[in-house]
């Protein structure tokens, strides 16, 4: 350095400035006609920006000495690099008709510089004092952001003794005054007044960055670091983003050490005359002396650029932009669009995309299809009153242990750019929604984001959902339907966005799912939570030799060959691009699809009101909205801009397989049907007890097997059908019994034939049968159900056998239609 006009000139920094200016003038990409950063100036003009983004890879290709100087001593050369950018901008504006970036009205306007694409990413734990002043890049998760406040960059001070003005006093990470007045006759060192109108301020924001989960060593807690954002990069990082910050490490005074109780390490010169009469040293007077004598410093990261880790922001699937900026909208290149169209034209592409979801898990196609539709989502809408209509799809997976529920959640959290994985057992209401914390420096209360806020515009995966406390489950009611979080705490009243899809996993209450009971008895979840899920899937671990063989073969093959064992049709990168492109579409409902939607909803409501129907929860308008969202997601998966009736039918099928047939286990009635179609029963036996022939073991042989095959056909009905018929018959018998008791005369029971005729007439009045064959088949099923209710379940009892008139041979035969039935007094309807 040499003295020049009373000031020292940094010759090395001046040379770096000139070389960097030459780089901006001359650097060209291969086969490019004009300089690369001349086109960058055009982009700066279009977005009215004062920040020039420089690719550090270009600097490395241009001059190795320049890149080494910038990397090693960035903090020293940073003002000179900004000055080079300003000179480059001033050169390019001459002789042009375009609006200049720096106008004549504001010649002191600064041009900021932002580097990106640094080759080596540092881990947060590697940032120490050795990195102070160097240009580095670090990746982490943003956990907290402060409000944007003004920061003093260069101050203009007025001497209170002589009135002299000192300009351009650079601030050194704290309030910095001139050391001494420049007036030779004035020796003022402490009496200064800041002239705010002539000082230079900029936007300032502090962001808390935390290590990513992959970088945390075993047995260690995640570390955090404060990141300082300035100028135009404020509000670029949001809580929950995984971000790459480029900048330098700086040592800043620790304000918390000043305010905390106890002794502080302080550097001072021994001066007896500065002690007062009691021998006690003077205290720190305000923040002016902060950092002057205190030895309490901490590391902070001063960033010059912010880059989302996955290279691009997620698609905004709402009508408005994420931050109200058109530049944030997803843009696809022609190559990416061609690749998406190629995937769409692959034969049977939908099933291949479903198979590409979580390929490490064998089978479970319905759940994979639900996860794909959840990743795509429906179309978000806003009413004229400003009410948001949810477009995100919520999915709940209930299943036995070791059914790969957590693997589905982990995979989904990894494929989405903005996602949060948490466990319900260890999550509180504040941890899921938001909490109010105290700002360490200002002492004011601020809102710290919870899991649902961090997953805004993404997916929140909650494992062990049933293990959450009731008060914690209530906290997410609003977030699941209105997609907002309302907070009224510590003087803060705010409504925060939680526009996220929820993928939850829960275990049955008894450890295993009991198919004989409805879903509400198997899962410890209230109906208010269950109704907010669009799809609820049950995973039951049943022994099946064929399925078990294929699962074992798949798992062993994955352990043996790792990635080679998995050969999905589309890779994860292709799947991400396809989903991102499909989410940018906003399909509209066609008139034909509207008709199918209305008819399907009416049919579902009619089935819900049928006695004995066993569904996961009641059919409400929420399920109609779920059908709309699923139809739009299916249309997106096919890259259609219009929702077709076929999409609606597929959505109805998904809804039926998830919540209506959730307990659709089969009931085998083959042992309870009569060989002669159930018209006669042997006279020597009590109808309420099994016959001796039934009790005696049958001899094995081809004759007996043939007789069994010809005498009885296999009769299997669904559990829902069985329960519906059972409850209808029991209710009719109870009504008859009450009427007889009230009148005081008549028989308490009903004839079986009259009971069957009543049920068939009731169903026929509702249009349940279309032919005589269906009626005969239904009568056969009802007879078998009655036999089971008498012989096995004991829900019905036989009061009288009801002997029929003598036949031609003079023998009296008992018929099942003529016997009198009643409800067992100990039976209680569920």
Curated annotation (Swiss-Prot):
It catalyses: ATP + H2O = ADP + phosphate + H(+). SMART domains: MCM. GO terms for molecular function: ATP binding; ATP hydrolysis activity; single-stranded 3'-5' DNA helicase activity; single-stranded DNA binding; zinc ion binding. ATP binds at residues 399-406. Its main location: nucleus. A motif (Arginine finger) lies at residues 531-534. Pfam families: MCM, MCM6_C, MCM_lid, MCM_N, MCM_OB. Its EC number is 3.6.4.12. InterPro entries: MCM, MCM6, Mcm6_C, MCM_CS, MCM_dom, MCM_lid, MCM_N, MCM_OB. The keyword Kinase does not apply. Keywords: ATP-binding, Cell cycle, DNA replication, DNA-binding, Helicase, Hydrolase, Metal-binding, Nucleotide-binding, Nucleus, Zinc, Zinc-finger. Residues 671-710 are annotated as: Disordered. Component of the minichromosome maintenance (MCM) complex, a heterotetramer composed of MCM2, MCM3, MCM4, MCM5, MCM6 and MCM7. Belongs to the MCM family. This is DNA replication licensing factor MCM6. It comes from Oryza sativa subsp. indica.
């Amino acid at each position: 350095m040499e003295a020049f006009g009373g000031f020292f000139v940094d010759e090395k920094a001046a040379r770096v400035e000139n070389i960097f200016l030459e780089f901006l003038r001359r650097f060209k990409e291969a086969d490019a006609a004009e300089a690369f950063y001349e086109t960058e100036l055009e982009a700066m003009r279009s977005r009215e920006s004062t920040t020039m983004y420089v690719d550090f890879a270009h600097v490395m290709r241009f001059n190795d000495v320049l890149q080494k100087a910038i990397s090693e001593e960035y903090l020293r050369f940073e003002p000179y690099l900004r000055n080079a950018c300003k000179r480059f901008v001033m050169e390019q504006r001459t002789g042009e008709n375009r609006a200049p970036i720096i106008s004549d009205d504001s010649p002191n306007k600064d041009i900021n510089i932002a580097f990106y694409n640094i080759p080596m990413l540092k881990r947060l734990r590697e940032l120490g004092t050795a990195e102070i002043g160097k240009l580095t890049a670090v990746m982490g998760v943003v956990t907290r952001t402060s409000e944007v406040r003004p920061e003093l960059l260069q101050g203009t001070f007025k001497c209170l003794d002589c009135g002299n003005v000192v300009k351009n006093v650079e601030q050194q990470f704290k309030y910095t005054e001139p050391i001494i007045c420049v007036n030779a006759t004035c020796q003022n060192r402490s009496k200064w007044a800041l002239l705010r109108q002539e000082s230079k301020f900029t936007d300032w924001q502090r962001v808390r960055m935390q290590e990513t989960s992959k970088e945390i060593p075993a047995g260690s807690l995640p570390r955090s670091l404060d990141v300082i954002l300035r100028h135009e990069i404020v509000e670029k990082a949001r809580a929950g983003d995984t971000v790459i910050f480029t900048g330098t490490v700086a040592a800043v005074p620790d304000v918390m050490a000043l305010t905390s109780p106890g002794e502080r390490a302080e550097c001072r010169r021994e001066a007896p005359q500065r002690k007062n009469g009691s021998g006690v040293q003077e205290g720190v007077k305000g923040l002016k002396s902060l950092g002057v004598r205190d030895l309490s410093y901490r590391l902070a990261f001063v960033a010059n650029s912010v880059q989302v880790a996955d290279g691009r922001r997620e698609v905004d699937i709402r009508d408005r932009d994420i931050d109200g900026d058109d530049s944030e909208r997803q843009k696809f290149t022609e190559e990416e669009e061609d690749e998406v169209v190629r995937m769409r034209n692959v034969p049977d592409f939908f099933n291949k995309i479903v198979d590409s979801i979580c390929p490490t898990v064998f089978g479970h196609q319905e759940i994979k299809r639900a996860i794909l539709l959840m990743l795509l989502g429906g179309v978000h809408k806003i009413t004229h009153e400003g009410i948001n209509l949810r477009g995100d799809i919520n999915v709940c997976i209930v299943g036995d242990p070791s059914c790969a529920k957590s693997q589905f959640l982990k995979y989904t959290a990894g494929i989405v750019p903005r996602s949060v994985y948490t466990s319900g057992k260890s999550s509180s209401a504040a941890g899921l929604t938001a909490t109010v914390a105290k700002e360490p420096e200002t002492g004011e209360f601020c809102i710290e984001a919870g899991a649902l806020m961090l997953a805004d515009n993404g997916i929140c995966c909650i494992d062990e959902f049933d293990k959450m406390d009731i008060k914690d489950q209530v906290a997410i009611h609003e977030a699941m339907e209105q997609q907002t979080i309302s907070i009224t705490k510590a003087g803060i009243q705010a409504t925060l966005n939680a526009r996220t899809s929820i993928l939850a996993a829960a275990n049955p209450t008894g450890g295993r799912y009991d198919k004989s009971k409805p879903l509400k008895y198997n899962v410890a979840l209230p109906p208010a939570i269950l109704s907010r899920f669009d799809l609820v899937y049950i995973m039951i671990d049943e022994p099946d030799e064929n399925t078990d063989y294929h699962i074992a073969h798949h798992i062993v093959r994955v352990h043996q060959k790792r990635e080679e064992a998995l050969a999905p049709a589309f890779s994860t990168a292709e799947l991400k691009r396809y989903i991102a492109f499909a989410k940018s579409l906003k399909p509209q409902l066609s008139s034909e699809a509207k008709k199918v939607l209305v008819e399907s909803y009416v049919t579902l409501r009619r089935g819900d009101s049928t006695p004995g129907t066993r569904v996961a929860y009641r059919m409400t308008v929420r399920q109609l909205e779920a059908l709309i969202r699923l139809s739009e997601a299916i249309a997106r998966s096919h890259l259609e801009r219009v929702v077709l009736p076929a999409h609606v039918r597929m959505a109805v099928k998904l809804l039926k397989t998830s919540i209506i047939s959730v307990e659709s286990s089969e009931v085998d009635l083959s042992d309870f049907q009569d060989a002669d179609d159930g018209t006669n029963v042997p006279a020597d036996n009590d109808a309420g007890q099994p016959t001796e022939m039934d009790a005696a073991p049958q001899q094995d042989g081809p004759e007996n097997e043939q007789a069994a095959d010809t005498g009885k056909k296999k009769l299997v009905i669904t559990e829902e059908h069985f329960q519906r018929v059972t409850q209808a018959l029991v209710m009719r018998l109870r009504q008859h019994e009450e009427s007889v008791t009230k009148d005081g005369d008549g028989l308490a029971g009903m004839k079986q034939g009259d009971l069957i005729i009543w049920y068939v007439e009731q169903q026929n009045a509702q249009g349940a049968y279309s032919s005589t064959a269906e009626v005969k088949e239904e009568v056969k099923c009802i007879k078998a159900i009655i036999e089971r209710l008498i012989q096995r379940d004991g829900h019905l009892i036989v009061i009288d056998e009801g002997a029929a008139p003598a036949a031609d041979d003079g023998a009296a035969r008992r018929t099942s239609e003529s016997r009198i039935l009643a409800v067992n007094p100990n039976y209680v309807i569920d």
